[in-house]
């Protein structure tokens, strides 16, 4: 299944709980209001992403990717986080999902699972494999990724903040995806 011309930032990803809205440059203040919580980043490789100047780099990269989303709670209309696709490889029929963060009040519930289901359902229309790359110290994200059916398939070092840090790669294949 090789498709090279895929829109990885569709405007219609939503369910009863959450809506994913394409991230644009004008969204900075609204999403930074969520990201400014230091506890969100305590397990991430970039632990100081709650600082405006550090988050600005993350945000600019997300907007430039053309594959990032705001996560919106449909009940309240509140912006609760962000996520994105990245690393699309048509020849490998794969893409990655990541760079996800959620406001703490939405941790441990249905919101992460709901957003991942929307992203996975969409991705599996075009690819056979979806990867997740998670810092080795980010046990919260590792557990959340395993809860949706991903399996750890690799360990690798990645440069983060000028130093090599251990990361884990998780995989969900289309044939194994349960809706």
Language-model features: where?
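Conserved GNAT acetyl-CoA-binding A-motif
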Residues: 125-134
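A conserved beta-turn-beta hairpin within the catalytic core of GNAT-like acetyltransferases
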Residues: 88-97, 111
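Conserved beta-strand in the GNAT
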Residues: 70, 78-87, 96
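A short, well-structured alpha-helix characteristic of acyl/acetyltransferase catalytic modules
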Residues: 1-57, 175-179
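Conserved acetyl-CoA-binding loop-helix of GNAT-fold acetyltransferases
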Residues: 108-122, 143, 147
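Conserved active-site alpha-helix within GNAT-family acetyltransferase domains
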Residues: 138-154
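A short, internal acetyl-CoA/4′-phosphopantetheine-binding micro-motif in the GNAT/acyltransferase core
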Residues: 72, 98-108
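Conserved catalytic-core motifs of GNAT/GCN5-like acyltransferases
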Residues: 133, 151-167
């Amino acid at each position: 299944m090789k498709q090279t011309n895929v829109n990885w930032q569709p405007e219609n990803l939503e369910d009863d709980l959450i809506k994913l809205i394409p991230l644009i440059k004008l969204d900075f203040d609204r999403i930074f209001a969520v990201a400014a919580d230091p506890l969100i980043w305590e397990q991430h490789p970039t632990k100081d992403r709650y600082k405006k100047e550090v988050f600005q780099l993350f945000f600019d990269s997300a907007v430039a990717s053309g594959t990032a989303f705001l996560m919106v709670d449909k009940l309240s209309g509140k912006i609760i986080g962000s996520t994105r696709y990245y690393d699309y490889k048509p020849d490998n029929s794969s893409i990655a999902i990541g760079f996800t963060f959620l406001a703490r009040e939405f941790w441990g519930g249905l919101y992460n699972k709901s957003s991942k289901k929307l992203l996975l359902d969409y991705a599996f229309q075009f690819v056979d494999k979806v990867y997740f790359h998670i810092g080795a110290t980010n046990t919260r994200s590792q557990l959340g990724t395993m809860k949706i059916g991903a399996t750890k398939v690799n360990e690798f070092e990645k440069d983060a903040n000028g130093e090599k840090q251990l990361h884990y790669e998780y995989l969900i294949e289309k044939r194994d995806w349960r809706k």
